[in-house]
Amino acid sequence: MNLRPPLLALSLATVLMLSACAGGGTGVTKSSRFGTREHVDHQVATQLSLAKANFSVGEIDGRDGTLTNRATERYVASHPGSPAVRPDAKPYTTYTIRPGDFKYVGPLEPTNEGQAKMKYLTYESMLELVAERYHASQALVAYLNGLPLNPTLVAGQTLVVPNVEPFRIEALNVKGSGRAGNGNFVRISSERGTLEVLNQNGGLVAYYPVSCGSARNATPKGDWKIINQVPLPTFRWDDEMLNKGVRSQDFFMFPPGPNNPVGVFWTGLNKAGVGIHGNPLPDTLFQGRSHGCIRMTNWDVITLPQYVGVGSKVVIE
């Protein structure tokens, strides 16, 4: 993702984007099928336990996979002498769909021009809303409730979901957003696709999976710093910038929303066009490469301001 240098207009929660992001390929694999119900429950409980300890696995999906293995390895390495990850004792809770939830669900226009004319980029289905709210894959929510992948869900319907702190798009409150840094810093590995928050002594505070750039549009290595944090950003699509690296007047400005190409939160760096941001499709986050930015799930990216702020150092390796 290429982004213009920060403007004063950022106070209006507007970020001018100059190219689009693709997925992030970092050798990530996962099982294509669910195992037994017992195995799914064990995996969900393990993934949940890691997430609650600030070792994100991305989507909670109940399957074996690289992201869970990496988070487990990092957890064990950072807790020498401690027991291995203990699966969460209460991995599930329930959610009852409310009439007001449907305000955030609707069809998206199929073209850039059409989406640019929309006021808000909603979820495309209630299953998508519920899954993102509980940090889960849509396939897992469907599996847990005996549903097809394109179910018709209605207000009043109760679903079994992972027992996490819910990501509520209707009450998005990014705690600490825009405050000054507190001494913590960020370390990103482009090769492994990981982002770690460390304290002044180098102690690990939080761990996340991320996707980074390709050989053609590499995420820039070096020492940078955070210069802004923008909840619910807009997105500027410019084909000339994407293909030729030249800003043009032929562009589309996408409105905010969970399906905005940069998700629900932008953390800008003092490297023109580069930032850490959310993503509308968490299930495809690690299947390709970005155009230089660092992408996270929407529910992960909004937690960053709890640990780092404006002025915090970001080391990209």
Model-predicted segments: where are they?
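Bacterial N-terminal signal peptides that target proteins for export
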Residues: M1-L10
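C-terminal motif of bacterial Sec signal peptides marking the signal peptidase cleavage site
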Residues: L18-A20
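Bacterial signal peptide processing site
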Residues: A22-G25
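Primarily a LysM-type cell-wall glycan-binding module
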Residues: F34-N69, I97-H135
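Sec-exported extracytoplasmic/periplasmic mature domains
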Residues: A51-F55, E73-G81, E132-A136, A142-L149, ...
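Extracellular LysM carbohydrate-binding repeats and other cell-envelope/extracellular binding modules
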Residues: T66-Y104, L140-S177
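Gly/Pro-biased beta-strand-loop elements
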Residues: A171-N279
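C-terminal soluble interaction/assembly domains
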Residues: F252-E317
